[in-house]
Structure formats: C-alpha cells, structure tokens
C-alpha cells in the first residue's frame, strides 16, 4: 500500500533529522536501492558492520560528526536492505504473471539479512521511541516481502522459518520498546501511522510460516493506537496537509485501513464515533480535483468499450479508458477492499468518491493482475447497497477498464452482476463457454450472477450443469422435456423428490427474477416456459426435508424464495421449515439490512397458518427490531404494528415508548432515511395510521383511553401543520415543474449536473416532498374517528380545498357532463364536525355511497353526520320528527344491507355488535332528545294511537307509517347485538327506545330477560329505572336475595329518586330496621322529590324509625332533619286535596315535636343560646311551637322590664320568629297594662277631674316624667308594628282593645305611647321618628295628630325644635291640613327663624320650599335671613339651600341668594364638596344665570379633582353634564371622559330614566363614539320593552342612532328605527293618497 516511504530520498535519508514518515509508495525504497547498484547484471549488497546509534544528548559539533555519520549510514543501510527485498518481490510478482516458466531467482540478500538481524539484536535497546518506530517499519516491510516471496524446498523452508522467527522477535522487541516510552504522543503523526500500518498489514498475510504464534507477537500496541487518536483529534492531520499533501493522503488511507471494527470497539471512545467519517471527508475533499477528471470522462469512450465484442482469442487485454499517469501501484486490491469495508457506515457519496479514487486514480485497472481482478467484485460489493445512478456509473466505469479474464466464467459473471446492465462482451463470453465442462458449483455461481442476462437456451444448459449431481439424469431429462412441451405425457412417472439445496434455490431465484423482470427482453412465451420450469422444479423439491442452512443470510434467501413461490400460486407446504427459516433469518447481523430482513419475514407469514407459530415469529421480529430506540419504533410502526396482537408481551413497552413521542414526523425524530417504504407512499401518514391503529388495539386503550387520546391529539396537531405547510406544497409544485421541463443544454448541462453534489438513496430515502393523497388522508380521518379525537379547526380550510379540488378533478372544466361528486366518507364526517360547507345534499344516493364506501368501524359516525348535514330545523314538530325518522330508516336499511353483504368477510361478530350499538344509541337519543318530539311520540304510542293520530294530524298518515317502519328496522338492528351490547344498550337507551317504539322496547326487554339473572343488583335498579314495566321481574329477583347483606345502600340511594315506588318500598323495608338517623334523613330527602307518590305506609315507617333513633342524633343532624320535614310541610300546603293529607301532616308534626326540645328554654339567655345554634332556614318548622313556648314561659316575666322586652323582640325579629302571638302578648301586657297604668297614676297625682281620664292633648304645661325612655318605647312599638298584628276577636277584662283590626291595634298602641309622653320635645321626637318609617298608615295619622297639637301650642317650642317641626310637616305634606290662620304661627315662625342658628334657618327654608304658596308667604322674610348667615353656613347647609332653590320659581331675591352663595364658594373653592359645586352649576343652568367667572372656577376645580378619588353618584354626573349642555360652557375632555367612564362602570345600576338621560347627553355633549358611549349604547339598545313603552326613552335612543349611524351596526339600529321608518312611510303614503284624491276631484 502507498504508505511506507517518501519518494523524496534526500528528505528521507540525507537530512539532518530522522524523517517524519516512511510513507509514500510501498516500492519507493526499491527505487532508492537502484541508485546504489549497478545498472544491469546481478547486484551485491554489503551490509557493513555499524556501531550502535548514539543516544547521547550532548550537542554534536558540526554536521559531519561521527555520531551523525553513523546514524546516516545505519538508516541508509536499513533503507537499502528494505529496498532490496522489495525489488526481489517485484520481480517475483512480475514473473508470476508471465507465461514463461522455469525462471529461478536466487536470493543474494541472505548474508545481508543475517548482518541486519545481528545489528538489530544489538541495537534495539539503544534506540529512541521515534527510532524504534522507524526501524520497526523497515523490519515489518522486510518480513512482509519475505512472507510473500517465500519459495519451496525442505532446506530453504527451514532457513526461512528461522529468519522469519528472528524478524518477528525483533519486531516484538521494537514495539515493546516504543510501548514503554512516554514520548509516543510527541512523535510525528506520519511515523506513528506508518508503524501501525505495516504491523496491521502483517495480520492479513497468508503463509504457513507465519502462524498464530507469530501473529500474537506482532500486534499494534494500544499505546500507539491511543497516540494516533490523540493526534487525529487535534490539528495534526491539518498541519500535515499544509506541509505535504501527498504524505497526508497516505496517512488518511493508512488510518482507514487500520480502523477496523475490532479496533473501533477496542480503542474508540464515544466521542470518536465520527472520527473515521471526518478523516474520510478530509481525504475526499483533497482528492476531489483528481476524481473530478474521472467524472467528466466522455461517456462515448465507455459506451464504445461496452459495445465492443470480445476478441477472437478471448484473452487479449483491453486498452484502458483512462490511465492513472501517477505511477502508483498501491494500495493493493486487498487493501482497497479492507478500506472500503471499514468505511461502510459512512456517507454514500464519500464512499463512492473514495472508491473512484482508489481504483481509478491510485491504480491502473488495465494493468491489474488476475488476482487483483478476482478481488474487484469484493471491492464493489462494499457499495452494492448504494442504488443510485451515480453509483451505477462508477461501477460501470471500473468494470469497463478491466481486461476479460481467460477460462474463468465465474469471475466474468461476478463482474457482470456489478455492472448494473448487460455488457455485450461479457455476455457473449458466458454464452460461448461450454456449460457441460463446468463444475456444478461454478455453473450455479454463473447462474446466480448472470442468469438474468443470458439467453434462455444458455440458461437451460447452465441449469443442467448445476443440477447434474443433485438430481438423477432421468429427472433432468423429464424436466427439460416438460419445459419444452406444454403438457406431461400420461405415461410419465412421478419423479423422485429431492431436498432443497443452494443450487436449486439459485436456479429458482434466477428464474423468478427473469419472470418478474419488467420491461425486459423476454417474450411472453419465454416467461411462460420459465414459469412451467419453476412449477416442475418446485414439484421435485422436498422443502420439509431440506438441510438446515448454515447461517442467517442463506436462511433469509431461502425464506424469500418460498415467499415468491407462494405468491406465484405454487404449493409450498412447509410451515415448520418456514418457522425455522424465519427464526434463523432474524439472527442476521442488523446493519443496513434490518428493514429488509423484517420485510422479508413479514411477507412470509402467510405461509404459516397456525396462529401460535405466527405469534412466535412476530415476537422474534419485535425482539430483532428492538423496542427502546426511536428507529426501532419507526420500524415497528412501518412493518410490525399491523401484525401485533394486543396480548403481545412487547405491547406495553412499545406503547410506553410511543407515548413519549410528541410527533411521528420522521424528520423531527431525526430519521433521515426510512427503508422498506414503497414509492408514492407518504411515510409520515403511514406512521400515523399504524401508530393510532396500534394504540387502539392495545390493552392501554381500554384501561386509560384519555391519556392515549391526548397523545394522539398532539400527533394530529403536528400532522395537520405538516399537511397544510405551504413551503412543502411549493416544493412539490417546483419539483413537478422541474421534472416536466426538458433538458436543452446537451453536454454542457451534463457537466453541470456532475458538478452538483450527489443525492444518493441508500436503502430507500424518505421522500421529503411527498404528502398524503385523498385515500391516505381518509385512512387518517378514519383512525381519528375511531379514537374519538377532534380535528383542529384550523384544518377546515385545507379540508375544503381538498374536497373542491377532488370535485374539480372529476368534473370537466367546460361544464359538460357534470356529475355529483361525493366527498370520501371520513372527509364528509369531519366536514360536518368542522362546519365546512359541502355542496352535497343528503340524498339516498349519497347515503348509499358513504355507507358502502366507509370503514365499517365508523358507520355510526357517518350516520351521525347525515343528521348533522340534513339540517332538520323545522318549526313544525311533526315535520321535524318525520324528517328524522325517514333519515334513520334509510340509514338503517343501507346498514342492514351492508351487514348482509359483508358479514362473512368484512365484519367480525364483535365488531358488528359494537357498531350497531353505537348507531342505535345515537339515533335513538337524537330523535327523542327534544321534549316536543317526545310529546308527539307519546301521542302516537297511546292506545288507539293510529286513530288519534289521524284525527289530530289531519290525515298526515306518513308520520304514522314512518313510525311503524322505523320500529321494524330498529327490531332488525337489535337482532345483531351480542349479549354484552344488549345489556349495554338496554341500560343506556331503553327508556327512550320504548318511547320511540314500544314494540322494539319490549323486544329488547325480552332479550334482556334471558340474562337478568347475571345482572348485579345495581344494574337491576338501573334497568327498572329505564323501563318501569320491568318492576315485577326486578322485584322478584331482588326478593330472592338478602338485600341487607348483598346490596350496598349507598349505591341504591344514588338511583332511588327515579325508581318505582314498589321497588323503593321493597329495598327500604329490608334495610330500615338497621338504619341510623342520618340514613333515615337521606331517605326522606330523596323521597321528598316525589312526595306526592310516596305511599303513606312507607312514609310512616320511615318517620317511625326516625323517631326511634332521635336520641342518638346530634344537633346538626336534627337541624338537617328539620330542613327535610319542612319541605314536606310546604309541599302539603301547596298540594291539592287528598284523603291522607291530614294524616301525613300529623305524622310530620309529631316528628318535628319529637326533634324539637323546648323544655330547657326558660329565660332570655337560654333562648339566645338556642337560637344561635338553630339555623334560620328552619324558622317555619319551629315558629308556632316556639312562639307558644316563649309566650308562656318568657314574656310574662319581662312585662316590667322594657330592656328585656326590647332585647327579646329584636332577637325574635332577627331570627324571623316574632309572630303575632308574641306581639299581642307584649302589646297587651306592656302597652295596655303597664304603660297605661303609669298614665293613669300620673293623672291621679295631677288631680284631674274624677269624671274620667281627660285627653292628654288638653294638658297644658309640663307633665311628670315617665319611668321608661321614650326612645326604647318607640323602638319596641316600631318592632311590634312591623308585620301583621292580630288581636283576639273577643274582648276580656284584662284588655282594653276591642276588635282584631290591625290598623286599630297599631293606632291604639301608639296612642298609648303618645299619651305617655306629653312634653313638646318628646312629642316632636315621636313625630320625627314616625315620619321616617314606612309602616302602616296608622303611624302617619299619629304623626299628623302630634304635629297638629304642637302647632297649636307652638309658643312653648324652642326655635330649633320649631325648625324640626316644620321639617316634619313638610315631610308629611300636611300643610293644607293645618289651621295656620287660627294660630299664632306667623309670629312664632318669624321669631323662631330670627332666633335660630344658620343650620335651623336652612332646615326651615327647606321645609317651606316644598310648598310654593307657603314659600311666597314668607319669601320676603326668609331670603334676607339666609343672606345674613351665608358666610357661616357649612358645606352641607349650602348644598341644602341650593337643592331647595331648584324647586322654586325664579325671582330676584333667589338670584341674590344664589349670587351670595356663589361669592362664598369662590372664597372657599378648595374646601368645597363636589356635590355643592355641581348643585351651584345646576342652579345656574336651571335659572339661566350667566356667571362665567364662577362657572369656569367650578369647572376647573371639578377637573382638578378628577384625578384623585373621583367619586360621584349617577344623578350628580348627569346633573353636571346637563348643566354643561344648558349653560353651553366648555367642559374639559378630562372631566367629560371621567363622567362618561363613571356612567359606563355603573350602567347596570341605572334606571331607565337615567339611562335615557345619559343617552341624550352622549349626543348633546358631543363626546364622540368612545368606549364608554359604546357601552351605554349597547345597554340602551337592549331595553326593548322601554323602547316600546317609554316615549322619551325611545326618542333619546333614536337620536343616538341617528347621531352615530356609522358606528352602530345596522342590525342593532334597525329595531329602534323601524317604528319611525314605518311611521314616515305611512305619512308619505297618506300624502300621496291625499294628492291622488285631490287630483281626482279637481
């Protein structure tokens, strides 16, 4: 190999330093040796006695020192010694190729060898590390030459053995010397590589003198390998390329030679995996210029050579097409084969470049020896798996340069098979060889390699020669006769069957290849003859008796042959053999053939009929493929997933691996190429389909479907993006256009194409630009429907475009012969799911097409889509029901028709039942889901329904007929259900099925009755819930078992509300004796939903049990029971008449009394404790009992304690327990006795008239103080007056109230209160309190009476109290009822106002301002008083005055008052409240007062306050905006925005009036159509009732719609403006009619 020495001898031997490498052409030292010998004659080599090389580190003086001279002489002698052996080997090899014989070469190097060995023995220990490597290279080269040139003879062989032994020992010593050195990594890369190369090369020498003992001594030490890898990891190779490219090239080749599989596993780390590829890539980059010249070689030369016939002598060597011109004769052909094998895992393009460089640049193939030619097929087999046009071209280029070997048809056939096509001179040679003279083995080899290129007659001759030792001659004659005739003679005996062997398999394989060849030269007659030959030969072979194959590869070949024979219709009955072959084939080294192996074995599965044996093969295939890597999962999905059973032991592991994938896109999974995929199939789609199918068939789908659905959803989301990818579609279009465009540049185009990087397809590269067609996408959609996974909505546009493209493709563009094109079934289903508009109506033809064409597992989805696409939205319920029933009937008919046609081949029994069950569930639920449809069906199902239907439906017989037809079809569909699905359908839709068709429901129940004994008790309860008519059967089955021990009462409670009452009575009666208080409460709660149908005996038994276990109940449990019993009481109050109503109420009240314990409530404190723990929701249950208890035990002790009574009433009122009984007791006991007695006592003390009590209103002066505070008495009286107050109808001695009128009772109570407090201040407090109440009218009457009395005695009222009195009169609006003229009111009014403070004056002013007449009466007096106190008024008083002014007519006095208030506000503008400023602006706007300075200051202050805590109510905001509109002053945008934003946030709480006002202001303020205005607009447009009924609101909304007509959508404006448009049109019509009448009259 071109590695030992540099050609530059001056650098190699005469430099001052030891050379970097003995690398270059292996025969370079021979040239060097020639310089030191005479030209011609023999040569004599003298190896002088040399001293050992010095190892001293002392610097030498001068270049001619003795040490350097000795070193030069020693290495010069070694080089000449090596060159002599190389020259001798060259002559021996040249003489071996020469035809002359008897040439004997004497070896003149014996003495030199002895001297060199002696020198090596004495000098090895003194050599340095680099010197040891260098000398080891020379010695290994000498040993290699001697091993290859060893001659025969007993004496000579013994001498050679001794010499080889001595050289081997020296090499081992030198390697050990270098291995022990610590300077290996510092040695030059070329020196290290040369030593490693020559040592590795000795491993492949085939010589008996060099046995295993010698080979074990001569090995590359690990230290040298690690040093080499260290250099290659760095920049050593790059520097070497910069110094000497030729040497660097040889270093690369040397490394590729020694980088065997053994060395890679032993020395390469994980980071060195790509080191070989990197070195190869660098070598290819350097040699590209040389191989490029070979690529652009004119094709004409090769074509001419391929078409030249072989010469007549058959042995002349052909002229090479191209010569190297470099002089290289290394590496050898064997070394080329080793290099190519070591790079078999690298890039195909780099491997082809290396092959071209080794065989066409480094070697001259025309000068190759026969041994080299015999190795050419081995070299070419390393790239046989590269099936590209470039690879074929390179192989043809190589083979075309070889000369035709003589008398070696086997080698010619091997060369021919690598050419890729028939070479005429090779074929002519093979057809001219006499086949009978060949051995059977050689004949079989020729058939194997060139059988497809030979003529049929020549092939027959080769077959006879190959089979003559296997079959008897009679069988061969018979076989030949049979192949030439069409029939076998009747007298022909049955030939003896022979076991299969390699020759028979070869013959059959070649014949099958000739038959299967497409576009070949064979005629149909020859193909028929070949098939007949195959059939007869197959009959002669006993496949079961075949000898087992020696290795997995022949087993795979035999298995493939059996598969092909079986596919051709031939009988191959050898299942055991097939199993053995499959198992043995799966032991083949995976490499690049794993996919092919799996594919071949999977294709052979039909030959095995036993399911167990098939399962064994499939499990072996999965183990062979692997389950833990991405590539293994991809292989599994492509080939094995359709074959795997759900019970496979590898299923769980594969599912686990699949769940880790977020996509099945091979590119994203970094699967650059996928083998075993036919062209035109989208790999991504195939992976997705098989992956989903595998998950659906796995056991995990039944245990955790949601997890698998999430994974499939993720896959589908990525897949839809892949399908919709516009870049991929563009590439497909561009590629198609480029493929169609013809080449027009001729030879120039060809050159350019050669310069482009090659695109190789090794083992079937993934078609990156392909996408799914409609059929593949249909399969994907089918898988999604089976998995229940939704298609992303974003895919709807792609789906629509595909359907339209399909319709356009099937319909011509000119519009002629238009036909209805239906979308594929799954496409149609997803169109309905995604609301994709499909221009296809639901017709019988369309339904038949989809049900016949769809996958049977999604028929229920297709039928579902029919209902969705039909769009049965009818207003008439009869039409809607008729349409749905017709659609269901037609679907069922087509379904049943397909069941009958394909049940034996397409439908398995379990699958049929599942699909029918899914279909029934959907159709029944869809037809009966609407309540109005259920009402019509009930009418049809009533007794005499046909007659009733005829009367009510007015002759619409079609609905009745369709109902009958659908019932028959449903019955036929139910017949296909299995037992498990009958149970499932019965428990899910039996109730609705009975409603749709009672006869069908009875039939289904009849089928269910046969398996009721297998139902669990819970399932029986669900059944009777769905079908109440089965209650007798269910009760009978339940009665046979012990319900207490066998039925879980909790499960029963979940369904008891919908069970028939007899079933409930049966189950509850069985469990009731052992139930606790909580269970009884739950039973009562569940039964309360159907209280009207609960039997009395069942309710009584449950209540009885509840009373028995009451003692063990907690307070919470009792409260819950109270809640439940309260429901029964409420229901009984609302329910109608019933015979047992009184008994039910009695039982419930008894239970309530049993639950309620009132004995411990004997004081106010205990009552508080009881009510705190008792929920308010139960007040209705205990109200009556508790009230009686409180009256009897608590109220009597509190009649003298006002605070206690007030606390009691407040407590009862808070808990909604202040009943009429308690009120009557307190009024009668406290007000009518205690309080009245105190009044009478005071009257006696004052010495009133003995004729009786005088009215207290006649008392003049102060009275005695009472013992009770007036505020507490008023609070108690008000609590008692809140709500109904009914006194007993008959009077008695202890009560002074007669009658039961509520008004009289309240009035009497407050009369007592009024009589008890006679001072003006107390009376005023009473009046003021009563005015603020919203109680009965009696309170107002008492308040008016008190005001009238105080007005009459107003002289005794203080000024401030007088203002409060005026406020009460104003709030009561009773000015007209007072007799002001007959009293001294005017005098007291003026005096009180004069003496009152500022606040009291404002209160008085507000009181008189509500009555215009009263105000005019005192206007001249009040206004000056207010003006005097403006400066001392508070903010609240100022706002009160301004609010009061708004309701008065405008006068000059009011204007002066407003002006004074404005002047005051200007001085304190920063301290003013926003409400006061708004009131001031509102007053200016109401009365039209123009005060720009004041207004601008107010607006500026309000704008300032917008940014910090801007809080106003809606009325204030509207007032501010309205003031701005009325006064026409400028509102800053910030203030306007804040106001409308406030309105936007509070729009939900605005009244209709406020909303209309805000809408009108949105137009008047001219704020624009902002977001806030948009919110107000939408809110206003939603008020349809107000728009119709409120004229002002409608006018405001219409104004808004006119103003913002461009912004508000028309569909929102139309309802508002429609009335106005209709009115305008009506007026216009009337005007036209009037004009027409006038013109007619005229």
From Swiss-Prot:
- Name one cellular component (GO) term: mitochondrion
What does the entry give for GO biological process? mitochondrial mRNA modification
Keyword Ligase among UniProt keywords: no
* Compositionally skewed regions (Polar residues) per UniProt: 49-65
Q: Does the keyword Mitochondrion apply?
A: yes
Q: Cellular location of this protein? A: Mitochondrion
The record describes the protein's role as: As part of the mitochondrial 3' processome (MPsome), involved in the maturation of guided RNA (gRNA) precursors.
Quaternary structure annotation from Swiss-Prot or TrEMBL? Component of the mitochondrial 3' processome (MPsome) complex composed at least of terminal uridylyltransferase KRET1/TUT1, 3'-5' exonuclease DSS1, MPSS1, MPSS2 and MPSS3. Within the complex, interacts with DSS1.
Protein name listed in UniProt: Mitochondrial 3' processome subunit 2
Source organism per entry reads Trypanosoma brucei brucei
| Phylogenetic placement of the source organism | Eukaryota, Discoba, Euglenozoa, Kinetoplastea, Metakinetoplastina
């Amino acid at each position: 190999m071109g590695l030992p020495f540099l050609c530059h001898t001056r650098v190699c031997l005469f430099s001052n330093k030891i050379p970097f490498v003995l690398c270059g052409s292996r025969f370079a030292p021979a040239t060097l040796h020639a310089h030191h010998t005479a030209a011609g004659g023999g040569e004599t080599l003298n190896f002088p006695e040399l001293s050992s090389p010095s190892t001293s580190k002392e610097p030498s003086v001068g270049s001619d020192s003795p040490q350097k001279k000795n070193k030069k002489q020693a290495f010069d002698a070694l080089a000449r010694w090596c060159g002599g052996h190389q020259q001798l080997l060259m002559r021996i090899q040249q003489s071996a190729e020469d035809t002359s014989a008897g040439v004997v070469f004497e070896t003149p190097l014996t003495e030199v060898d002895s001297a060199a060995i002696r020198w090596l023995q004495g000098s090895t220990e003194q050599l340095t590390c680099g010197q040891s490597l260098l000398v080891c290279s020379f010695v290994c080269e000498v040993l290699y030459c001697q091993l290859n040139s060893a001659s025969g003879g007993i004496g000579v062989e013994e001498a050679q053995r001794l010499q080889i032994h001595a050289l081997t020992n020296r090499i081992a010593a030198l390697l050990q010397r270098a291995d022990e050195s610590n300077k290996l990594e510092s040695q030059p890369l070329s020196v290290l590589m040369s030593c490693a190369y020559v040592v590795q090369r000795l491993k492949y020498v085939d010589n008996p003198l060099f046995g295993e003992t010698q080979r074990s001594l001569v090995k590359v030490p690990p230290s040298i390998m690690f040093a080499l890898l260290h250099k290659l990891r760095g920049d050593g190779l790059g520097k070497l390329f910069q110094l000497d490219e030729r040497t660097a090239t040889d270093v690369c080749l040397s490394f590729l030679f020694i980088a065997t599989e053994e060395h890679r596993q032993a020395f390469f780390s994980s980071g060195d995996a790509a080191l070989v590829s990197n070195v190869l890539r660098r070598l290819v980059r350097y040699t590209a210029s040389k191989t490029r010249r070979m690529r652009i070689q004119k094709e004409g030369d090769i074509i001419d050579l391929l078409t030249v016939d072989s010469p007549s002598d058959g042995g002349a060597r052909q002229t090479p097409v191209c010569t190297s011109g470099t002089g290289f004769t290394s590496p050898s052909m064997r070394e080329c084969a080793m290099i190519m094998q070591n790079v078999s895992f690298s890039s195909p393009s780099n491997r082809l470049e290396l092959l071209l460089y080794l065989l066409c640049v480094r070697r001259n193939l025309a000068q190759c020896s026969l041994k080299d030619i015999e190795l050419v097929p081995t070299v070419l087999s390393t790239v046989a798996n590269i099936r590209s046009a470039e690879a074929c071209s390179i192989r043809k280029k190589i083979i075309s340069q070889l000369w035709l070997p003589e008398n070696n048809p086997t080698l010619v056939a091997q060369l021919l098979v690598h050419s890729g096509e028939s070479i005429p001179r090779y074929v002519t040679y093979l057809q001219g060889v006499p086949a009978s003279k060949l051995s059977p083995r050689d004949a079989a080899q020729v058939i194997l390699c060139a059988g497809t290129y030979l003529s049929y007659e020549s092939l027959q001759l080769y077959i006879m020669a190959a089979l003559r030792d296997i079959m008897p001659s009679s069988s061969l004659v018979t076989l030949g006769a049979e192949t030439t005739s069409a029939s076998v003679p009747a007298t022909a005996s049955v030939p003896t069957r022979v076991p299969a062997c390699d020759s028979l398999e070869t013959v059959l394989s070649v014949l099958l290849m000739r038959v299967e060849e497409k576009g070949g030269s064979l005629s149909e007659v020859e193909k028929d003859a070949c098939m007949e030959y195959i059939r007869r030969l197959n009959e002669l072979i006993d496949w079961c008796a075949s000898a087992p194959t020696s290795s997995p590869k022949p087993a795979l070949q035999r298995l493939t042959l059996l598969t092909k024979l079986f596919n051709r219709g031939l009988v191959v009955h050898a299942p055991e053999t097939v199993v053995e072959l499959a198992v043995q084939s799966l032991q083949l080294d995976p490499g690049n053939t794993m996919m092919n192996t799996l594919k071949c074995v999977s294709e052979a599965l039909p030959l095995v009929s036993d399911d167990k044996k098939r399962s064994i093969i499939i499990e072996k295939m999965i183990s062979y493929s692997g389950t833990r890597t991405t590539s293994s999962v991809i292989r599994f999905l492509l080939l094995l997933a359709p074959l795997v059973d759900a019970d496979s032991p590898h299923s769980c592991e594969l599912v686990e691996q699949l769940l880790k994938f977020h996509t099945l896109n091979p590119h994203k999974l970094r699967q650059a190429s996928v083998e075993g995929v036919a062209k035109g199939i989208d790999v991504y789609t195939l992976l997705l389909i098989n992956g989903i199918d595998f998950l659906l068939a796995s056991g995990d789908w039944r245990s955790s479907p949601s997890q698998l659905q999430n994974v499939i959803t993720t896959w589908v989301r990525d897949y839809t993006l892949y399908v919709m990818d516009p870049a991929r579609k563009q590439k497909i279009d561009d590629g198609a256009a480029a493929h169609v465009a013809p080449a027009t540049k001729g030879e120039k185009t060809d050159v350019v194409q050669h310069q482009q990087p090659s695109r190789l397809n090794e083992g079937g590269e993934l078609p990156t630009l392909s996408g799914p067609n409609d059929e593949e996408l249909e399969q994907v959609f089918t898988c999604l429907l089976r998995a229940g996974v939704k298609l992303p909505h974003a895919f709807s546009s792609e789906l629509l475009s595909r359907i339209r493209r399909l319709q356009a493709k099937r319909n011509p563009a000119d519009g002629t012969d238009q036909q209805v094109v239906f979308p594929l079934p799954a496409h149609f289903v997803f169109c309905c799911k995604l609301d994709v508009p499909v221009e296809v109506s639901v017709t019988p033809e369309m339904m038949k097409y989809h049900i016949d064409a769809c996958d049977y597992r999604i028929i229920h989805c297709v039928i579902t889509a029919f209902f969705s696409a039909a769009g049965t939205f009818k207003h008439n319920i009869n039409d809607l029901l008729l349409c749905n029933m017709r659609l269901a009937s037609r679907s069922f008919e087509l379904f049943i028709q397909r069941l009958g046609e394909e049940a034996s081949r397409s439908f398995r029994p379990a699958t049929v039942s599942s699909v029918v069950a899914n279909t029934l569930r959907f159709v029944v639920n869809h037809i009966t889901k609407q309540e109005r449809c259920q009402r019509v069906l009930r009418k049809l199902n009533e007794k005499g329904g046909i007659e009733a239907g005829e009367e009510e439906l007015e002759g619409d017989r079609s609905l009745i007929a369709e109902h009958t037809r659908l019932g028959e079809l449903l019955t036929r569909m139910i017949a296909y259900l299995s037992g498990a699905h009958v149970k499932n359908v019965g428990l899910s839709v039996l109730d609705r099925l009975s409603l749709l068709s009672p006869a069908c429901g009875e039939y289904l129940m009849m089928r269910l009755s046969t398996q009721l004994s297998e139902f669990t008790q819970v399932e029986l309860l669900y059944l009777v819930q769905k079908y109440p008519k089965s209650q007798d059967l269910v009760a009978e089955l339940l009665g046979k078992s012990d319900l207490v021990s066998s039925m879980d009462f909790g499960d029963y409670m979940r369904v008891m509300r919908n069970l028939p009452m007899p079933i409930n009575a049966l189950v509850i009666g069985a469990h009731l004796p052992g139930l606790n208080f909580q269970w009884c409460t739950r039973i009562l709660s569940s039964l309360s939903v159907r209280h009207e149908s609960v039997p009395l005996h069942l309710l009584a038994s449950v209540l009885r049990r509840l009373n028995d276990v009451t003692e063990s109940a907690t307070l919470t449990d009792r409260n819950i029971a109270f809640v439940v019993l309260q429901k029964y009481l409420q229901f009984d109050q609302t329910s109608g008449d019933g015979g047992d109503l009184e008994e039910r109420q009695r039982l419930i009240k008894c239970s309530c009394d049993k639950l309620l314990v009132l004995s411990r409530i004997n004081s106010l404190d205990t009552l508080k404790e009881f009510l705190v723990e008792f929920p308010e929701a139960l007040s209705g249950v205990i109200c009556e009992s508790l009230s009686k208890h409180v009256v009897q035990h608590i109220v009597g002790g509190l009649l003298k304690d006002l605070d206690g009574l007030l606390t009691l009433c407040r407590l009862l009122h808070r808990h909604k327990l202040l009943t009429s009984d308690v009120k009557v007791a307190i009024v009668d006991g406290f007000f009518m006795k205690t309080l009245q007695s105190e009044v009478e006592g005071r009257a006696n003390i004052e010495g009133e008239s003995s004729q009786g009590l005088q009215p207290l209103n006649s008392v003049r002066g102060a009275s005695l103080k009472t013992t009770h505070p007036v505020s507490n008495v008023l609070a108690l009286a008000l609590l008692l007056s809140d709500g109904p107050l009914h006194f007993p109808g008959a009077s008695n001695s202890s009560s002074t109230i007669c009658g039961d009128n509520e008004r009289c009772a309240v009035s009497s109570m407050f009369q007592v209160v009024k009589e008890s407090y006679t001072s003006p201040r107390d009376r005023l407090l009473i009046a003021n309190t009563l005015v603020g109440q919203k109680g009965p009218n009696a309170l107002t009457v008492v308040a008016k009476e008190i005001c009238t009395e105080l007005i009459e005695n107003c002289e005794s009222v203080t000024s401030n109290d007088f203002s409060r009195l005026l406020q009460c009169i104003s709030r009561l609006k009773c000015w007209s009822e007072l007799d002001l003229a007959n009293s001294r009111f005017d005098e007291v009014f003026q005096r009180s106002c004069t003496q009152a403070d500022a606040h009291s004056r404002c209160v008085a002013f507000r009181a008189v301002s509500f009555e215009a007449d009263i105000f005019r009466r005192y206007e001249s007096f009040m206004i000056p008083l207010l003006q005097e106190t403006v400066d001392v008024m508070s903010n609240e008083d100022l706002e009160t005055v301004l609010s009061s002014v708004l309701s008065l007519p405008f006068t000059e006095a009011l204007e002066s008052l407003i002006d004074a208030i404005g002047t005051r506000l200007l001085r304190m503008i920063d301290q003013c409240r926003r409400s006061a400023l708004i009131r001031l602006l509102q007053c200016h706007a109401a009365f039209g007062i123009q005060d720009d300075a004041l207004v601008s200051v107010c607006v500026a202050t309000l704008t300032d306050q917008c940014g910090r805590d801007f809080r106003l109510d809606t009325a204030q905001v509207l007032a501010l905006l309205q003031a701005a509109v009325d006064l026409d002053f400028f509102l800053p945008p910030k203030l306007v925005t804040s106001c409308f934003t406030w309105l936007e946030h509070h729009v939900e709480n605005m009244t209709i009036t406020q909303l209309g006002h805000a809408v009108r202001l949105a137009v008047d303020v001219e704020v624009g159509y902002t977001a806030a205005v948009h919110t107000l607009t939408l809110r206003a447009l939603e008020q349809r009732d107000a728009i119709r009924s409120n004229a002002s609101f409608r006018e405001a909304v219409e104004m808004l719609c006119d103003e913002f007509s461009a912004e508000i959508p028309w569909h929102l404006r139309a309802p508002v403006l429609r009335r106005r448009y209709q009115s305008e049109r009506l007026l216009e019509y009337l005007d036209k009619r009037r004009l027409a009448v006038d013109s007619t009259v005229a």
